[in-house]
Amino acid sequence: MRLILLGPPGAGKGTQAQRLVHHYGIIQLSTGDMLRAAVAAGTPVGLKAKDIMASGGLVPDDVVIGIISDRLEQADAKDGFILDGFPRTVPQAEALDILLQSKNLALDAVIELRVDESALLQRVENRVAETTARGEQVRADDNPEVLSQRLASYRALTEPLIRYYSERGRLLTVDGMMAIDDVTRDIRRVLRRSGVPMSKFGVRRW
């Protein structure tokens, strides 16, 4: 089972990714973690990334793809994975498809957690009001203005990506505004219905 999970800030991607990992016996591949591991290990692409970051530059897509390629060769990735933080753009999605094809692999599904942005913002505003009323310090990430900017950025980047995967028949959409357990159940339901192959280890309870 090879998956991508898409969703805006506040949609609960982290929670659902961990539940997928546990339930299906696959691994979560975070581009940030893979990048740091490659740099620490001193791999060729890791050293290239290190030089770029040391000069203050952004790591280009081809280097990230190289790091993902190396990671997919490791034994624990053979039975499936969920990609976290990549792709974010259509060119990255195209590069990922080419990489997977070169390894005789393919994505099984791209799960989009669809949310009501105004409801997300209202949740944050309510949380800020409740925290302030208790005389407690508001968390740095509980900032409606910052969240609004992040949502706009996500929407601009991701809408073309969602179209890309929808046109290729890989997109599965789940209502991310439901309770956490209901979202989890719906993800499993759409995966079963779409015929996505399960991990060879089967499924587990959470």
Curated annotation (Swiss-Prot):
Organism classification: Bacteria, Pseudomonadati, Pseudomonadota, Alphaproteobacteria, Hyphomicrobiales
Q: Which GO terms describe its cellular component?
A: cytoplasm
> Which pathway does the UniProt entry assign to this protein?
Purine metabolism; AMP biosynthesis via salvage pathway; AMP from ADP: step 1/1
Q: Name one GO molecular function term.
A: ATP binding
Q: Which residues bind ATP?
A: 10-15, 127, 178
Oligomer and partners? Monomer.
Q: Which organism is it from?
A: Nitrobacter winogradskyi (strain ATCC 25391 / DSM 10237 / CIP 104748 / NCIMB 11846 / Nb-255)
Q: What family, per the record?
A: Belongs to the adenylate kinase family.
Alphabetized PROSITE patterns for the sequence: ADENYLATE_KINASE
Gene Ontology terms: biological process:
AMP salvage
Answer yes or no on keyword Transferase: yes
Binding annotation for AMP? 31, 36, 57-59, 85-88, 92, 139, 150
> What's said on domains?
Consists of three domains, a large central CORE domain and two small peripheral domains, NMPbind and LID, which undergo movements during catalysis. The LID domain closes over the site of phosphoryl transfer upon ATP binding. Assembling and dissambling the active center during each catalytic cycle provides an effective means to prevent ATP hydrolysis.
What is the stated purpose of this protein?
Catalyzes the reversible transfer of the terminal phosphate group between ATP and AMP. Plays an important role in cellular energy homeostasis and in adenine nucleotide metabolism.
Cellular compartments annotated: Cytoplasm
- Main location as per UniProt: cytoplasm
Q: What keywords tag this UniProt record?
A: ATP-binding, Cytoplasm, Kinase, Nucleotide biosynthesis, Nucleotide-binding, Transferase
Q: What is this protein called?
A: Adenylate kinase
